[in-house]
């Protein structure tokens, strides 16, 4: 059988990435051009800046991905691309490049949900057994997803307000930490003690919903009041207390979901899945099911995860037309 090579594009936010996947599971290349340095001074992602950077580097990323994979344009079998959710301008750059490449070479175009990409990055660790449950935690999303089979996703719980990664970045900004603040807060948390009593919203309620806005507000108020009084708070203890509250919420809801949906596998994915505190809590407390977390290089936004997610769409021949457009608010229940 002839080998299949999928060229995948990811430009949903501030990472320009192009990857090549051979057959179902051999990731030959995963080129990522990060924009973090450009956005640091703004304390967050500026959509217009992100779009311009994507335009500047995407052609070079395509060339590098093909070269690193050791293949030519003529070897590519199909093109996969993130079409949502994300920043509309950023998404359009990747879509335009992917459609142009596919059209020029007469190749099928595979539409991929960005969050499905995070989830299916776990396929890089080992073949996934369905049904499974997934906890998706990133800068823009916090979701519990039931996956009956590859490509069939159902959100069973999600945040009512802030995503967990968003809460980390806002708290980091208050403390004057460099954007993105997640890794630094995680590191500082491991040096401090959980001494501040922050709220754990809805932790005892019998649902699978999350809420982080109250925790974020409590943190900001404590920090602001201390500043007003001229008091000094331990940054390490603040981070430890904040992270402990976040992890208590995530673990409580995940355990409830596992009780409701008796599966054998839990996938934890998204940028926040790189958090050491989360990985430690999962290892210590989730012992009845197999926990699969993608490697660190596949936790953040990258085209490799889009390539993995595209395999099930390829198998279903779920190809898009040239009118495929960006869907910045795309959810699992509104996929093409």
Swiss-Prot record:
It is an enzyme of class 2 (transferase). One of its GO terms (molecular function) is iron ion binding. GO terms for biological process: tRNA threonylcarbamoyladenosine modification. InterPro entries: ATPase_NBD, Gcp-like_dom, KAE1/TsaD, Peptidase_M22_CS, TsaD. GO terms for cellular component: cytoplasm. Its cofactor is Fe(2+). It holds the Pfam family TsaD. Disulfide bonds: none annotated. Substrate binds at residues 136-140, 169, 182, 186, 275. Fe cation binds at residues 114, 118, 301. The keyword Plastid does not apply. Keywords: Acyltransferase, Cytoplasm, Iron, Metal-binding, Transferase, tRNA processing. It is found in: Cytoplasm. The keyword tRNA processing applies. It catalyses: L-threonylcarbamoyladenylate + adenosine(37) in tRNA = N(6)-L-threonylcarbamoyladenosine(37) in tRNA + AMP + H(+). Binds 1 Fe(2+) ion per subunit. Its EC number is 2.3.1.234. Its main location: cytoplasm. Signal peptide: none annotated. Belongs to the KAE1 / TsaD family. Required for the formation of a threonylcarbamoyl group on adenosine at position 37 (t(6)A37) in tRNAs that read codons beginning with adenine. Is involved in the transfer of the threonylcarbamoyl moiety of threonylcarbamoyl-AMP (TC-AMP) to the N6 group of A37, together with TsaE and TsaB. TsaD likely plays a direct catalytic role in this reaction. This is tRNA N6-adenosine threonylcarbamoyltransferase. The gene is tsaD.
